[in-house]
Amino acid sequence: MPKRTDLRTILIIGAGPIVIGQACEFDYSGAQACKALRAEGFRVVLVNSNPATIMTDPDMADAVYIEPIHWRTVEKIIAKEKPDALLPTMGGQTALNCALDLADHGVLEKYGVELIGAKREAIRMAEDRELFRVAMQEIGLECPKAEVAKSLERALEIQAKVGFPTIIRPSFTLGGTGGGITYNRQEFEEIIKRGLELSPVHEVLVEESVLGWKEFEMEVVRDASDNCIIVCSIENLDPMGVHTGDSITVAPAQTLSDKEYQRLRDASIAVLRKIGVDTGGSNVQFGIDPQTGRVVVIEMNPRVSRSSALASKATGFPIAKIAAKLAVGYTLDELKNEITGGKMPASFEPSIDYVVTKIPRFAFEKFPQADARLTTQMKSVGEVMAMGRTFAESLQKAVRGLETGKVGLEPTGLDLSSEDDLVVLKRELKAPGAERLFYVADAFRAGFAVADVYALSYIDPWFLDQIEEIVAAEGRLVTDGLGSIDGARLRQLKRIGFSDARIAQLTGTNEVAVRALRRVLKVKPVYKRVDSCAGEFATGTAYLYSTYEEECEAAPSDRRKIMILGGGPNRIGQGIEFDYCCVHAALALREDGFETIMVNCNPETVSTDYDTSDRLYFEPLTLEDVLEIVEVEHPVGVIVQYGGQTPLKLAKALEANGVPVIGTSPESIDLAEDRERFQKLVQQLGLRQPPNCTARTAEEALVLAREIGYPLVVRPSYVLGGRAMEIVYGEADLARYVRDAVKVSNDSPVLLDRFLDNAVEVDVDIIADREGQVLIGGVMEHIEEAGVHSGDSSCSLPPYSLSAATQDDLRRQVIRLAQALNVIGLMNTQFAIQSNDDGSDIVYLLEVNPRASRTVPFVSKATGVPLAKIAARCMTGKTLVEQSVTCEVVPAYYAVKEAIFPFAKLQGVDPILGPEMRSTGEVMGVGRSFAAAFARAQEAGDIRAPQPGRAFVSVRDPDKKRVLPVVLALVERGFGVVATAGTYAWLQQNGVACEVVNKVAEGRPHVVDLIKNGEIVYIINTTEGRAAIADSFSIRREALQHCVTYSTTIAGAKALVNSLEFRGTGPVWSLQELHKELQV
């Protein structure tokens, strides 16, 4: 069936901000869908609230709306753009839920919009746990025994039938939010209450336990003529009980017999037919009892998913692109598989002759209070994928791609001769955490047999054999040393994935010595192509991975090449914003006639799409792996300043190995990062920093702190995302920090800065060229005060309260800094501004980062200036004048960026903001005034607007004066006020009628009781010092559990209260309309 001619305009809904369970894989699928549909001549309208995505670039769709993904807002867009169809399968759970809301509220019917890709009934049947179970029974497939409950009483009745342990899965939530595994009645009641509250339809599935069963996924694509193909089978190394997003997964499945594989293949196709997914990709999950072979269907997603991004990258088959074309009427046999140059139709099932391993990346170090055990609720923030000719090779490559500091299956640090530590080891094997893989390796070091490890972990013995093999090879290396290794043995070690760095660790040498030995013995990797057909057809697409075999398929050209190093796995502090910059660099330099080479190992991203750059190397970002690629490709320049801290850490070593690093020199990067050298530069330029110093011992830290004065911001040097950063208010606090939080030494000193209380923080992004010309990209004023990590603070462009004179002063300082550091490309600078009593401002320089920052995409969207593209051209030698961009663009509207946090997913974590970054994503709102833009950003971030009721106020002494106008504004809007004793006295004194309530420590009834009883609608709570923060923890946590809006800074509270009247009001603007205003 050729494409439909009755559709002209198609609306695509994106996935919104990056959250746990929904990361940049939907930017990848959405961007593919936009490109595919526009190439077919359709007009595409896109809505997505996340400015850090490639899909929201103005040239990705005909009309791009960075607006809240709520049915009311989307209705305004539908009324304005009049689409013929809505494609809801590219934006994850967010888009599906929004599409169902639009259908349920009659919006689609009212405007005559057709759902394509997945029908309303199909979405409902797949997402509604009870309907799905009944549907499976009708086609003779089993689900785990389970029933749906809409109340705690009903849940307890079902639990009595299925027994403990019990699995709880809320309906219509993302990444298993609100779910879990329970072993006793108390846990059961807790999780049921939470699940019912977090499910948008207030229902949960109470399910029998299939813990320890094997888990498999099938990625299926089906067209309107009922042609079905299996793109990929995926096996979870971790058994059932760990969310598939948190499991180590392997493709293709390794431990299925052919008969079992055919059985799952037939079952997954039957599931798609029954649910009614008639065009597009779906993912079906199965559990298999290893003892009896019983197969159950766990669930299916009637959309592209995290697994389909993985399957696409693993096979080279672009699922989202194909799914988009199937949704407009094509059939699989009419479409070509582009990776083979169109030699095969898309109806050929991909076949692969290598093994792919995905390992998730966690961020528990950011949330020490979180429960780090892995369950059915997803907790990972990113993932890494690696390819090899054997499972062992791809596993070890993935481990070093994770960037957790491990270069192989390193020991966990347990003393394996101690009885106590062996108890810990057994517990870690039984109750999985983020590091379980390393404990498995430790178990073999401790002499456990495969059967022992299986009995504790239920990881299939086939995988355990492979890990045992790696550990045995390590043992032989330790005994024999580097001197005894010949070419054959070294090649064998490389074939099972050993890195040079790991071999060096085991033989007590260094990486340089191992590399030199490899050179002498001529042991070098070759590069193989990913072609989706196991080499059956020749492919012109250069999508490559390394392995140690005979024939190399890299076939490099002799064109001028630029290599871009990506950011590796997503994590807190280094996310999609950096991938956005890498993609822009590839696109711009490709337009300029360079051959672009991307190196990255994150399967979720647009940068690892095989048609983003000319050549893609899917490899870990380590010195060894990058140098090998450089040797094959000989680029004229390598860009390290776009992938965050990951490639920056390699800059000096690359330069030392003769690699041409372009842009700002590694020497300048080091000057900006080295505190003492940078301090001298700041003094030479006559700029002002907060009083600060560097301590190399714990004693020195305490002495220097007395000179600077408290409060202090303390942190280790060289960190991204404020890792291990803290504000300390006194000597006892500092002593604890240098004792517990960091190991202070000559090589890793600790940095002390005077903390500027109540200062306004400002971010400035600029581009500089080789002639020292500087383009100001944007000046952003933070809404939260200094002391909240810049990545966690909301910010406004242009600034909403800074005077023009102060803004000009900032511009002058930034230009001088960029010139002094010889920046070529992007630079981000952070300032803090303190107001004097006479109204004048003092500007303090906080830090300079001569690299792409996480605000680049936001600034580009707000101003219409593609900063990353312009800066990439500056790095290859073009000046700003040659690119005709010399003037800063300051919009007449306001754009506000709001950070999105994972607190709901992580039980036990304090949602207070501080100097350590904890947000996973961001949204953007635009308005004609700051308050209107802030309101739109809050809507996009799903932050509830408090309706008049009782507001609870409890603030530290320095904030009492500043909270008064905020409280008066609340009273004016009809709110009542409840406060703790000190705040109550101050408000009473100033004529505010309010009630007093106990702090938690003062006895009951206290404020937490009021929150639990639903008597509080809004909370303003500021604290300082560890003790006060700990005392008020339960207030913030209960507020989060009961979905009560809260502010932990005065500036945040003021912005929120002033924006309430703008909630849900105002027209919607496309980026194209906004950018047109800027060009007038």
Swiss-Prot record:
Mg(2+) 1 binds at Q285, E299. Binds 4 Mg(2+) or Mn(2+) ions per subunit. GO terms for biological process: 'de novo' UMP biosynthetic process; glutamine metabolic process; L-arginine biosynthetic process. Mn(2+) 1 binds at Q285, E299. Residues 943-1080 are annotated as: Allosteric domain. Keywords: Amino-acid biosynthesis, Arginine biosynthesis, ATP-binding, Ligase, Magnesium, Manganese, Metal-binding, Nucleotide-binding, Pyrimidine biosynthesis, Repeat. SMART domains: CPSase_L_D3, MGS. Residues 1-403 are annotated as: Carboxyphosphate synthetic domain. It comes from the Bacteria. Residues 943-1080 form the MGS-like domain. This is Carbamoyl phosphate synthase large chain. It comes from Xylella fastidiosa (strain 9a5c).
